[in-house]
């Protein structure tokens, strides 16, 4: 990887506050692109539009999904946009490349019953459960990203206003409220989780050694909770974010409020959460439609 690509990744990390997971995706995209350059004996600074079209064909020949191809092309377009800010002689070969539209999908989310089962798993006040519960509570109660969670400092928690200040994408701060259950889990954690009482830093969420937890560590914790919970097959940080948004909208929250809570710049990004479960659809239908039920039915 050359110095331009390394500087590009560093800019995404420092200035745009991208998560480890997102940065890894960008890095993988660049590595694959570099393999193509080497294979075709091409150079980054002389790469042309026709080469970009050939690269698009190359990705299709590797049987990648449209979403993956779209992301990889977007990564390279953004790379060249960054490079153009440093060198006026650089031309973006991907700027006019028509790449496939992303496949539409409905975000996965957990049912309320599944969430209750997960919280039941970590309700006993062991040292590990104190930490695991605060992770689960914060992700579900606030809908924050895992990259935002691992960077929360103890001073970011406001018990007076019942909320937390997080640093989101683009280094933008936002305040997100939390409820009584989340507050209680944080208080219990701060009071009884021994590693946090003896650590020499301000990070809120720690591993069992008293070190600031990583994004990978959070995923490991959630996977472990799932293994201990009957009837729940999968949970990950972004699924909890989907669940947070879906449950709010299902209970009548307006889209603009959810947009603000999630830290989305565009309302269209939040719009993908407006799906509701079949159970919720049926409940609304039965309660709202005048001919949904006969008079003797309840």
UniProtKB/Swiss-Prot annotation:
Main location class: cytoplasm
Alphabetically ordered keywords of this record: Cell cycle, Cell division, Chromosome partition, Cytoplasm, DNA integration, DNA recombination, DNA-binding
GO biological process: cell division; chromosome segregation; DNA transposition
InterPro entries: CB, DNA_brk_join_enz, Integrase-like_cat_sf, Integrase_catalytic, Integrase_recombinase_N, Integrase_SAM-like_N, Recomb_XerC, Tyrosine_recombinase_XerC/XerD
Top-level taxon of the source organism: Bacteria
Record keyword Ribonucleoprotein present: no
Subunit composition and interactions: Forms a cyclic heterotetrameric complex composed of two molecules of XerC and two molecules of XerD.
Family named by the database record: Belongs to the 'phage' integrase family. XerC subfamily.
HAMAP family hit by this protein: Recomb_XerC_XerD
PANTHER family in UniProt: PHAGE INTEGRASE-RELATED, TYROSINE RECOMBINASE XERC
This protein's name: Tyrosine recombinase XerC
Name of the gene encoding the protein in the UniProt record: xerC
């Amino acid at each position: 990887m050359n110095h331009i690509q390394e500087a590009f990744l560093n800019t995404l990390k420092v200035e745009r506050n991208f998560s480890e997971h997102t940065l890894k995706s960008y890095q993988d995209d660049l590595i694959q692109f570099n393999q193509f350059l080497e294979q075709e004996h091409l150079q980054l600074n002389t790469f042309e539009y026709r080469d970009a079209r050939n690269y698009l064909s190359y990705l299709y020949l590797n049987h990648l999904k449209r979403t993956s191809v779209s992301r990889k092309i977007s990564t390279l377009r953004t790379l060249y946009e960054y490079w153009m800010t440093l060198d006026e002689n650089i031309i973006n070969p991907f700027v006019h490349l028509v790449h496939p539209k992303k496949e539409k999908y409905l975000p996965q989310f957990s049912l309320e019953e599944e969430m209750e089962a997960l919280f039941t798993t970590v309700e006993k006040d062991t040292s590990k459960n104190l930490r695991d519960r605060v992770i689960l509570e914060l992700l579900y109660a606030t809908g924050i990203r895992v990259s935002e969670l691992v960077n929360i400092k103890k001073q970011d928690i406001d018990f007076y206003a019942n909320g937390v200040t997080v640093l989101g994408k683009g280094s933008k701060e936002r305040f997100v409220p939390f409820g009584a259950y989340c507050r209680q889990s944080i208080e219990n954690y701060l009071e009884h989780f021994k590693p946090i009482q003896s650590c020499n830093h301000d990070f809120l969420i720690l591993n069992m050694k008293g070190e600031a937890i990583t994004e990978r560590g959070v995923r490991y914790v959630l996977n472990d909770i799932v293994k201990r919970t009957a009837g729940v097959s999968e949970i990950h940080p972004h699924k909890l974010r989907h669940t947070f948004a879906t449950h709010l909208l299902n209970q009548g929250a307006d889209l603009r409020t959810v947009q603000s809570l999630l830290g989305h710049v565009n309302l269209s990004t939040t719009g993908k959460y407006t799906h509701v479960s079949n159970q919720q659809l049926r409940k609304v239908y039965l309660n709202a439609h005048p001919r949904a039920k006969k008079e003797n039915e309840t």
